[in-house]
UniProtKB/Swiss-Prot annotation:
Pfam families (alphabetical): DNA_pol3_alpha, DNA_pol3_finger, HHH_6, PHP, tRNA_anti-codon
Protein name per its UniProtKB record: Error-prone DNA polymerase
GO biological process terms held by the UniProt record: DNA repair; DNA replication
Keywords, sorted A to Z: Cytoplasm, DNA damage, DNA repair, DNA replication, DNA-directed DNA polymerase, Nucleotidyltransferase, Transferase
Xref: HAMAP family: DNApol_error_prone
Coiled-coil parts of chain: none
SUPFAM superfamilies: PHP domain-like
Main function: DNA polymerase involved in damage-induced mutagenesis and translesion synthesis (TLS). Along with ImuA and ImuB is required for the error-prone processing of DNA lesions.
PANTHER family: DNA POLYMERASE III SUBUNIT ALPHA, ERROR-PRONE DNA POLYMERASE
Subcellular location: Cytoplasm
Organism whose genome encodes this protein: Caulobacter vibrioides (strain NA1000 / CB15N)
Induction: Up-regulated in response to DNA damage in a RecA-dependent manner.
Length: 1083
């Protein structure tokens, strides 16, 4: 007897949000393991999950069918829709686009009429409701008649008492309507073990606890994939229902591999092809990039790249990116390409990238390779405040029917998973909050039992253990779709005939359902239009330098003076607060050890403080060899296998240590004799080592390949271990070089013009590692005067102002480096109104500037000028009226006394002759502590004093020393330091170590918290805002840390800042909480 065959045609992934309880990949691989012919992915009104299932099955025996469950708004039963060819698939995606664009984000509104308009080439399985009433019979007859031989009736076993009667009824309805029954198991998860999770997400969807869910949950755990034998047994009275599943599969000719969209044609000059136009643009750019002539080496590189671009039919793509960059620059928007595109001389000549790949010997095959056959991927960073202008240009140029932003998947993270699971299981809010509070950062490190115990929870308690297990299952599930940060997909045919397009939350934005990984799997080309805060800061800095300092020669990144020794002096001193990419504690610790003296050193600096080199044990060998503390050893292949210097060619500039992905690929090709295709497979496998372990095929081939060519086995194994490190995020050299450019530019601005640097960084917030309070402090330590927000002189942004009369620049701290030649020309930084919490740029500032221009000085005059009362209160509380002789309390009193909010009040005749506004009264002065507390509450910083200075005597009594004392303490000395917690950082490569930065009135102290100490004091380390760290001094390479042993949380003490004599009248609104300044936490 022939074994049964079966295809599951009703499988729901977790992209049917809060319904499916398995990943698409799990469904596909389980279907293969159980021997199914095919599996059809039919998410609700969505194609978001199908590419993942298709990708997982690409090289396997299981076939994944692309389908969709269409739910209708007009009462028609749902339909499992399967397109039979490419054109039918285009109709389905257009249908879904129509439904999504007419609805709110995340919804899709369709009618049966909509479907009929797009039904050509579609097969449909009609999904019966639970109750088979007369209206369903009418719908069934109509739908089957409309589809004329292309419809079936989906029949599933509900495992209920009346199952067989229901199936018999469906079989009868199918026979009379012309839509015969077909067996499905209406799959919601790949295996029965996922049933509890499906119950939980059903409760989340239905907004109820599991105790009250009742019939809203599935009755059993049978909605999983079943084998052909099991389905044949379940439908033994209706064997044709099982056989029809395979017959339907045979009628479906469409496969996702059929999607190979052409890139849109670009307009070119008359008589020119796209390739000829690209060639002209490239050589024109080469003349601009190389004003002294294009060398033979560069010429050969450009010619080879153009040959490959033509062969692979990519010229239109390069013209597109060139056009976008050209348009951005015409609008005065700073931009720079990065990533693998920096390997291309064509991109460099087109002005897309800023790094000369021939100068740095970068590998073009990392960008484009005919062996890989993958489309190029160009990432371009734009100023983050102006990127939207560039994106709207792309929409306008190509049309929304041909351009859209990639989707991105918002996943469940530990905290959100815990909260949803806790609600579903009926846990109290207190218990759920305690569970969520054990998670560090957004992804955390799971829910270890010791963390639960530290939070006062018993990990063995059944309800806790169950919640933790289900939360761990839910982590990584998709919650909803959103738009990618800037990946554009452009197509020659209508994009909505390739993928559904939906509404984004942002006005005038649309995005597709597939994310960048889906796009890569399908081979579609995209352009990444990304935002980078540092570019915005640099552009603002260059504008200030031209307008305030007369540096008219400075117009572009290329104009920045190159290789200035003072810039490297500053970086070697780890004086890098605010400098792009090298401002973290790890980078600051590395700078004095690496001691950069030229641009390529910055490339190394960017790349070396990454998880890849750290995990691959590359950092210490590189530093020792660079600093001549150990010799560089160059193992050689046997003479018959290659030149003795083959490793030196690959690793010479990094002292024999592979720091970059390109070097790993070259090592595989030259030393282990991988083909370029195999080396690219190794590059891709780097991304999977962390999750799947090292594939033996690559390990063995690499090691045996090197050993077979005469290298020692131990050396070959060490090389592969270093390559494995790249699975933990290592930089390509091209990417590091692009970022190093911005490291140098931002460092030069900080060194030469720290006044401009401070103002530009604050104006570009939010960005970077530090908050305005630390940027201001750093500027003042470099000798820059910083002035508070002022009602008469501030703008929204920070501006440069004349130095105050009597200002005496402080001596620059010994650990701070600045240009002495420009120092006499530095100006003061006037903080802008942006620093005052609650003020609105578009509503509050225009009337304020207008009133000020008309002579307003007092609160009453600004009120008469139309400044809202709320804005005047915020300005008064921020002490912005000091320049007109009003203290904080006096200004607030005056504002509170105004009789009208936006204009002077109309005076009643009875009150004629009385003053319109309250007269000035004598109010008690605020204590210094209160002034500082109010500064922090209103502007997040204070120029008057540092809060910790008020606690110095108390701290001294506890044996706590100021941060500046660390400079004079010996290695190993016991010490206690205290301060506001600025930054908590827990890198994934640090094996549980946490780095904490404290700030007091004398400087900053950096504490290292080893894992055991962190686990013992987890809550204090994670939450304290004012902290004493007790430990020992660690000094190495001019870097000082405190290795923490224990902690004292003083956060509650901060509330005493306002507890001074002289209560405000009227009382300033808010209390100062125990958190003056919110830390920035990184993980």
């Amino acid at each position: 007897m022939r074994p049964p065959v079966y295809a599951e045609l009703q499988a729901t992934t977790n992209f049917s949000f809060l319904r499916g309880a398995s990943h698409a990949e799990e469904l596909a691989l389980t279907a293969e393991a159980l021997g199914l012919t095919a599996i059809g992915i039919v998410d609700r009104n969505s194609l978001a999950g199908v590419v993942r299932a298709w990708t997982a099955a690409k090289r396997r025996s299981i076939r994944v069918l692309t389908g969709c469950r269409l739910d209708f708004m007009d009462g028609a039963p749902s339909l499992l829709c399967y397109p039979t060819d490419r054109e039918a698939f285009g109709r389905l995606t257009r249908l879904l686009t129509i439904g999504q664009l007419r609805a709110e984000k995340g919804e899709c509104h369709l009618t049966w009429r909509d479907f009929l308009d797009h039904s050509e080439g579609q097969l449909g399985l009609i999904v019966p409701p639970r109750v088979l009433d007369d209206s369903f019979e009418q719908h069934l007859t109509r739908m089957a008649g409309d589809l004329r031989g292309r419809s079936w009736l989906a029949a599933s076993r509900a495992y209920a008492a009346r199952d067989l009667q229901r199936l018999a009824r469906l079989e009868s309805l199918g026979r009379t309507s012309g839509a015969p029954i077909v067996a499905t198991n209406d799959v919601l998860y790949h295996g029965p073990e996922r049933r509890p999770l499906q119950d939980v997400i059903s409760c989340v969807r239905e907004h109820c606890a599991i105790q009250e869910a009742g019939f809203r949950l599935e009755a059993n755990a049978e909605r999983h994939i079943k084998s052909p034998e099991e389905m044949a047994r379940l439908f033994d009275r209706w064997p044709r229902a099982v056989e029809r599943t395979v017959e339907i599969v045979e009628r479906i000719g469409f496969d996702l591999k059929d999607i190979r969209e052409q890139y849109p044609d670009e307009p070119v000059p008359p008589g020119k092809t796209a390739m000829q136009h690209l060639t002209d643009l490239t050589w024109k750019g080469a003349a601009w990039r190389y004003p002294n002539g294009v060398s033979p080496k560069v010429t050969a590189q450009i010619q080879e790249e153009l040959r490959l671009i033509e062969k692979m039919d990519y010229p239109n793509y390069f013209i597109t990116v060139h056009d976008i960059v050209r348009e951005a620059r015409s609008m005065g928007i700073l931009c720079q390409g990065r990533g693998s595109a920096a390997n291309s001389s064509v991109c460099f000549c087109l002005g897309v990238t800023a790094i000369d790949p021939t100068e740095h010997r970068l590998l073009f095959t990392r960008f484009i390779s005919e062996n890989r056959g993958e489309p190029p991927d160009i990432d371009v960073d734009f100023e983050h405040d102006r990127r939207e202008e560039v994106m709207q240009y792309v929409f306008q140029r190509y049309g929304r029917a041909y351009a859209a932003i990639c989707g991105t998947v918002i996943h469940y993270r530990p905290r959100s998973a815990i909260r949803d699971v806790g609600k579903a299981l009926g846990l109290t809010e207190d218990v759920t909050s305690l569970l969520a509070g054990t998670v560090w950062g957004s992804w955390g490190d799971g829910l270890p039992e010791d963390h639960l115990r530290n939070a006062g929870l018993d990990p063995k308690a059944p309800e806790i253990a169950r919640a933790v297990g289900l939360a761990n299952d839910l982590i990584g599930f998709p919650r909803h779709l959103s738009q990618h940060v800037g990946g554009f997909v452009l197509t020659k045919r209508r994009l909505d005939e390739t993928v559904p397009i939906g509404k984004a939350a942002m006005k005038d934005r649309t995005f597709i359902e597939w994310d960048k990984d889906d796009i890569d799997s399908l081979g579609l080309m995209k352009v990444d239009i990304l935002a980078l805060g540092m570019l915005h800061a640099i552009q603002r800095a260059m504008t200030m330098l031209r307008e305030d300092h007369g540096q008219d020669w400075l117009k572009d990144l290329a104009d920045i003076p190159k290789e200035v020794p003072g810039v490297y002096d500053m970086l070697c001193a780890a004086d890098s607060v605010g400098v792009f990419q090298v401002e973290s504690r790890a980078q600051m610790s590395m700078l004095p050890r690496l001691r950069p003296r030229e641009f390529y050193d910055l490339v190394i600096q960017v790349a070396i403080v990454r998880p890849g080199p750290i995990q691959g044990d590359m950092v210490h060998p590189y530093l020792k060899r660079r600093n001549k503390e150990e010799p560089v050893d160059w193992p050689k292949p046997s003479p018959e296998h290659g030149p003795p210097d083959e490793l030196q060619e690959i690793l010479g500039k990094t002292f024999g240590v592979p720091l970059f992905q390109e070097q790993a690929m070259s090592l595989a090709i030259e030393a282990a004799k991988f083909t370029p295709d195999e080396a690219d497979g190794l590059r891709k496998a780097m991304a999977t080592f962390r999750n799947l372990g090292s594939p033996d095929a690559y390990r063995n081939k690499f090691i045996e390949g090197m050993v077979g060519r005469g290298y020692e086995r131990a050396f070959a194994e060490r090389c592969f271990k270093q390559i494995e490190g790249f699975s933990h995020y290592g930089f390509p050299e091209s990417h590091a070089a692009s970022f190093a450019k911005l490291v140098y530019v931002s460092a030069w601005i900080k060194w030469a013009w720290p006044d401009v640097f401070c103002a530009a960084l604050i104006n570009a917030q939010p960005m970077g590692f530090y908050q305005p309070a630390q940027l201001v402090r750093d500027a003042r330590e470099h000798g820059v005067e910083v002035l508070p927000p002022d009602i008469l002189t501030s703008d929204w942004d920070c501006t440069l102002a004349p130095i105050s009369t009597g200002f005496r620049p402080p001596r620059v701290r010994h650990d701070k480096v600045a240009c002495q030649e420009t120092r006499p020309r530095w100006k003061a930084v006037r903080l802008g109104f942006r620093q005052i919490k609650g003020l609105r740029e578009t509503l509050d500032i225009p009337p304020l500037l207008k009133a000020r221009g008309e002579g307003a000085r007092t609160p009453a005059e600004f009120a008469q000028g139309g400044v809202p009362q709320k804005a005047l209160e915020l300005l008064a509380e921020a002490d912005a009226f000091a320049s007109v002789g009003l203290s904080r309390r006096e200004a607030l009193w005056a504002v509170k006394g105004l009789k009208g909010e936006h204009k002077a009040p109309v005076q009643a005749p009875l009150l004629a002759g009385l003053p319109l506004f309250e007269e000035r009264v004598a109010l008690p002065a605020m204590a210094a502590t209160q002034e500082v507390a109010e500064d922090y509450r209103t502007t997040s910083l204070s120029l008057k004093a540092h809060p910790i200075g008020f606690y110095r005597s108390m701290l001294a009594a506890r044996g706590v020393v100021p941060a500046e004392r660390l400079l004079s303490l010996k290695d190993g000395a016991r010490v206690s330091v205290a301060g506001l917690v600025l930054i908590r950082q827990r890198p994934g490569t640090a094996k549980g170590v946490v780095f904490v930065t404290l700030e007091d009135e004398t400087g900053v102290a950096n504490a290292v918290v080893w894992k055991d100490r962190f686990d013992a004091a987890r809550n204090v380390v994670m939450t304290a805002s004012f902290l004493i760290v007790h430990g020992r001094v660690q000094r190495a390479d001019n870097v000082i840390h405190v290795v923490a042993e224990r902690f004292t949380d003083l956060s509650a003490e901060l509330s005493s800042l306002r507890d001074e004599p002289g209560a405000p009248a009227p009382r300033i609104r808010q209390k100062v909480s125990g958190r003056l300044l919110r830390s920035r936490d990184f993980h």
